[in-house]
Each structure stands twice: as structure tokens, then as C-alpha cells.
Amino acid sequence: MSGTKTVAFFGASTGVGLSALKHTLAAGHQCIALCRNPSKLTAIFPTSTTPNLKLVQGNAHDVAAVSKCLVASNGQLVDEIISSLGAAMNSTMGMDQPNVCAKGMETLLAALAQLRKDGLTGRPHIVVVGTTGMSHFGRDCPLLMVPVYATMVKNPIKDKKISEGRLVDSGESYTIVHASMLTDGETNKKIRIGIEDPKQGRESMAIGYNISREDTGKWIADHLVLQLEGKYVQKIVVVTN
């Protein structure tokens, strides 16, 4: 797909999603971002200097709000969808929004189905951001990190597995990005890539401890938005340093 794309963002107020949004905007693409508090993004991307960003206030579990983000200016479905939804951990190591990803995916797929029923056409490529430590085909993280994923990140992983399973079974076009433990700060470190087919198994392996949120978002923009590389379509992609 060439030319200017319209890309919908969910969970782009911070972290990986924010980085992907920044680089997509900088490339001149039209972006629509759903956020509960639009002022978080207008503080970073002022309306006067970012005419290619449309903000929609709402919740990712509301079909009506999500639907508003999925319609491009031509009246058809957007070209791509980037979802980096996730729940913060509370003081007891629980999730502040249990099932946030699973509910978010259910809502997204329901919104797409309703819009198509209403006559809109298109097959957006859906990119979701997850974590290593949840492969069905063996260990995809350093051995020392296995206890961390099994305890501290157990509930978020359970939620993301449900979400990703729904996406894989949906028949939509997708790429699932599994980042190793996320750090802060843009770097020039080499990014290593592993590819896994969610139904057929692992094609290549990359095991590492961490990668920054900024670098992950930039990689998503470069390889899945600015140029959608076919080798990543219908695949799980591990990104790590």
C-alpha cells in the first residue's frame, strides 16, 4: 500500500504506542487516536502544528467510541490499527483494569463487524503490542526472566493471551509484536527479530532481556506502518536488543 495512510491508535498516550504515533505523524500519515484524556496528547502534539492528528475522547471498551476511530476521511475503514492497550500494576501486584486487553480486542472486532454491516469496506492491518514470556512454542526469554514472567506478569500475560487468541482467530490481517522487558529512552541499539507463526510454530528466534518503549514504537512505525513488510503479516514478532 502506497501513499498516505490513515492509522487508528489505541493506548497511544504513553510508551510504545506514543512512540509509534510520533513517528507515524512525522511521516505525514493521518492518525486518529482514542484517549480518555485528550489533553495528554495535545500537550505533546499541539493542534496548530499537528493537523494530521485527530483525537477522539472515549474508552477502548466502548464500541461507539472505538468505531469513531475506525472511519477514515473517505468514509471507509482505516488502513491500519495500532493497539498498545495494557493495565498498570497496583500496589498488590494486581491489575488496575483486569481483562483490559481481552475486552479491548472484543470491542475492536465488534466495532469492525458493525461498521462493515453498515456498508463500510476495507481490511485494516491490526498491530497489537504484547510481551515475551507467552509463546506457545517454547521459551522466548532469558532463563533468568522465566520466574518474573511466571509471577509478576502472570495476570497481564493471561489477559494478552486471550486478546491475541481472539485476533488470530478473527480472520483479520494482523501482526502481534512481543517486546522483551521495556525500558525508557530512545537508543541506537541494534534490534533483533524473531518470527513465530501462531499456528505453525517458530520460524526464527531472538532472546534478549530488554528493549526501550521508544525503540519498539519506532520499529513498529518503520516496519509495519511506513512500510508494511509482508514477512510480518499473520505473524508474532519478537523485538529485543
What are these regions (language model features)?
Residues 47-107, 111-114:
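NAD(P)H-binding glycine-rich loop region in Rossmannoid oxidoreductase-like domains
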Residues 6, 79-80, 125:
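Structural motif
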Residues 16-21, 108, 163, 220:
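Hydrophobic residues within alpha-helices
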Residues 193-211:
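A conserved pocket-lining segment of Rossmann-fold NAD(P)-dependent short-chain dehydrogenase/reductase
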Residues 92-189:
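Glycine-/Pro-rich loop/turn segments that contact NAD(P) or position catalytic residues
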Residues 34-39, 59-60:
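N-terminal Rossmann-fold cofactor-binding loop
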Residues 15, 205-241:
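Mid/C-terminal beta-alpha module of Rossmann-like enzyme folds, strongest
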Residues 2-30:
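N-terminal Rossmann NAD(P)H-binding glycine-rich loop of SDR-like oxidoreductase domains
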